[in-house]
Amino acid sequence: MEPRLGPKAAALHLGWPFLLLWVSGLSYSVSSPASPSPSPVSRVRTSYNLGKTFLGLDKCNACIGTSICKKFFKEEIRFDNGLALHLGPPPDDLPSYSANYSDDFKTWRPVEISRLVSKQQNKISDGRICASAAAPKTCSIERVLRKTGRFQKWLQAKRLTPDLVRGLSSPLLRCPSQRLLDRVVRRYAEVADAGSIFMDHFTDRDKLRLLYTLAVNTHPVLLQIFPGAEGWPLPQYLGSCGRFLVSTSTSPLQEFYGAPPDQAADLAYQLLGVLESLRSNDLNYFFYFTHVDADMFGIFNNGHLFIRDASALGVIDRQEGSQAASGAGDNKDIFSCLVSGCQTKLPSCDTIPEKQNLVLVCSQVLPLLLQAKFPSPVQEEIDAELTRCADGTRPDPEVLGAASRLKDILRPLRTCDPRFAYRYPDCKYDDKF
């Protein structure tokens, strides 16, 4: 299948060099005789340099990584036609971009190109780094970060231990176990020869990239260590380039608020199932959200619901136990302050109840998906269980019970047809439908 290009874009065959030109604010007209075009070599060189700035490659190694950069420059990742139709620059402050991805130029699939944080937040973070060293606003942020006491400890470390991440603001690292941190190192996809719990194969550059990512946004790390291919409800991590990551594409749950009743019931049923898997799974990790909104959940084109944004997801190790972030305030440094105030106080992991995910989703997401969708008796039952599920003052068992009853109500409201390709045609042979 060819990528989704409009007629004008198809005629121009806008690949990565052209995309970089207008992404960086240049305009180039193939039909204007008024001014001669630059030579192809000059144009590609300029495109490459400007593209480095757009992607954040000029900020490396204060970035995510470079594992997928070749795909961009070989034109195996192309922006969606919504941008390709314009030769002027697209908005460069969007949180994400739709694109098409190919391994052979013959078959293409939709992907999402996402920033770790907003462009404005990047500017603030970079400014804080320079200010921490009393340096000019345009300092070498990599040089400043390399001189920090935390990174010097990372350079000497053979293994990623809890003391090396203590004080970072991410919920993933609020009370990490050694088992969890070993999993981070073993599955970190931005280095060659992944698989060991020791960091002997990490270069200085690799360590800085991992530390920066953990400090700014752990979403790409979670996609790597809990991959969808193993049954985790997360999209596939395809790689990163500069300060962007590439993952499989999903549509935000918010776009389905107007869905027909059977589809709304199916999505709500799936979402409750996802929350159940976060609470109870074979690896004995308890995943919890610090906050939720509809954009954090997404739907693949086969109807399957996943967690689209894992940046607000924390992990507590029930098997090994987590090392509490005691003394975290004594470990705060510039890495602790890149995306939040240095004075931000994080709640203890011991205070996270099992009901937390359900209370958040039942109060802030499901009502908008399920409101006024069903006949009166059924709708009243749904609303009643949603109210119980959203009540944070109730004990854990009562909230969990309300969620279970809500699933029981939703189950027979789902239908079996090709719109739900993730479970069709198997559902035809299931007596629950």
UniProtKB/Swiss-Prot annotation:
Signal peptide: 1-29
Pfam families, per database record: PIP49_C
Glycosylation sites recorded in the entry for this protein: N100
Swiss-Prot/TrEMBL keywords: Glycoprotein, Secreted, Signal
UniProt xrefs under InterPro entries: DIPK2A/B, FAM69_kinase_dom
Domain of life: Eukaryota
A GO-annotated cellular component: extracellular region
Secreted listed as a keyword: yes
Keyword Hydrolase among UniProt keywords: no
Main location: secreted
Compartment(s) where it occurs, according to its Swiss-Prot or TrEMBL record: Secreted
Family: Belongs to the DIPK family.
The protein's name in its UniProt record: Divergent protein kinase domain 2B
Organism: Bos taurus
